UniProtKB/Swiss-Prot annotation:
Predominant subcellular localization, coarse grouping: cytoplasm
Source organism (scientific name): Bacteroides thetaiotaomicron (strain ATCC 29148 / DSM 2079 / JCM 5827 / CCUG 10774 / NCTC 10582 / VPI-5482 / E50)
GO molecular function per UniProt: glutaminase activity; imidazoleglycerol-phosphate synthase activity; lyase activity
PANTHER family the record matches: IMIDAZOLE GLYCEROL PHOSPHATE SYNTHASE SUBUNIT HISH
Gene Ontology CC, one term: cytoplasm
One Pfam entry name: GATase
Protein name: Imidazole glycerol phosphate synthase subunit HisH
Function: IGPS catalyzes the conversion of PRFAR and glutamine to IGP, AICAR and glutamate. The HisH subunit catalyzes the hydrolysis of glutamine to glutamate and ammonia as part of the synthesis of IGP and AICAR. The resulting ammonia molecule is channeled to the active site of HisF.
């Protein structure tokens, strides 16, 4: 199986690569369109700022390529947000794979800290990514923007209010949390994606 990780100006690519290696998978980290198109699975990770990153994707043509991939594609954190219609971070139009907008967390109480950082449970899982999961699985989040619960929600969590911990539509899968930083639970998410 050929797994490609999209290389672009976003952090966290190496930690995804290490997580895949722990599962015995040698991924190719690349921006080469032919390699991405011919891969069996594509992972679209990211830590960064939505506006700057979308500008880079558009300048390189990776925006159109990612939208048109037909194999399973897995967006992580910023990768998930960039798969949405629009982001309040940078007020930028995104890939519009998921017809939903990315919103900024607004603290409601003094103890609400932004970014949402740390371990949280996920529930209402509705995707093959979460095969074998219980209702109380802990995963690791680091983000200041979120995707509301919507028709594409594949898992939910709650911080300040309920939001999408994962999305799924056709061949596109995505998590707001970082499976590569979520221990054995995260490894199971990655393995379930690779087994699709």
């Amino acid at each position: 199986m050929k797994v490609a990780v999209v290389k672009y100006n976003a952090g966290n690519i190496r930690s995804v690569d290490y997580a895949l290696k722990r599962l015995g998978v040698e991924a190719v980290i690349t921006a080469d369109k032919e390699i991405l198109q011919s891969a069996d699975k594509v992972i679209f990770p990211g830590v960064g700022e939505a506006g700057t990153t979308m500008n880079h994707l558009k300048a390189t043509g990776l925006d159109e390529l990612i939208k048109n991939l037909r194999q399973p594609v897995f967006g992580i954190c910023l990768g998930m947000q960039l798969m949405c219609r629009h982001s309040e971070e940078g007020e930028v139009d995104c890939l519009n794979i998921f017809d939903v907008d990315v919103k900024r967390f607004v603290p409601q109480k003094h103890e609400d800290k932004v970014p949402h950082m740390g371990w949280n449970t996920i529930g209402k899982t509705n995707s093959k990514l979460f095969e074998g999961f219980t209702e109380e699985e802990f995963v690791y989040f680091v983000h200041s923007f979120y995707v509301p619960v919507c028709d594409f929600t594949a898992a939910e969590t709650d911080y300040i209010h309920p939001f999408s911990a994962a999305l799924h539509k056709d061949n596109f899968y995505a998590t707001q949390f970082h499976p590569e930083k979520s221990g054995k639970t995260g490894e199971r998410v990655l393995r379930n994606f690779l087994d699709l």
